[in-house]
């Protein structure tokens, strides 16, 4: 499952991807993907960026390029 989450983030490219869209790609509830995204962030493969502000803010995830 972690590999599938990473694949979804990688496919998004420079546009990034929201957690909700990762869940849609993996065909699971998006909150269940959060654990895998956190693991990928700890490993240094993925980073998150907050878009917007207030109640309309969301996080997009990107693959770190070496």
Locations of the language-model features?
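Short, leucine-enriched amphipathic alpha-helices that occur as contiguous helical runs
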Residues: 1-6
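Short helix-to-turn junction characteristic of helix-turn-helix DNA-binding domains
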Residues: 9-13
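Short secondary-structure boundary/hinge segments and terminal tails
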Residues: 27, 41, 57-59
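Short amphipathic alpha-helical interaction segments
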Residues: 27-39
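A short, conserved structural fragment
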Residues: 41-51
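Short, cationic-aromatic polyanion-contact patches
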Residues: 49-66
């Amino acid at each position: 499952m972690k590999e599938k989450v990473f694949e979804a983030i990688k496919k998004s490219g420079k546009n990034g991807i929201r957690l909700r869209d990762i869940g849609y790609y993996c065909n699971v509830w998006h909150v269940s993907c959060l654990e895998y995204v956190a693991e990928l962030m700890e490993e240094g493969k993925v980073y998150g960026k907050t878009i917007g502000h207030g109640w309309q803010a969301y996080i997009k995830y990107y693959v770190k390029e070496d």
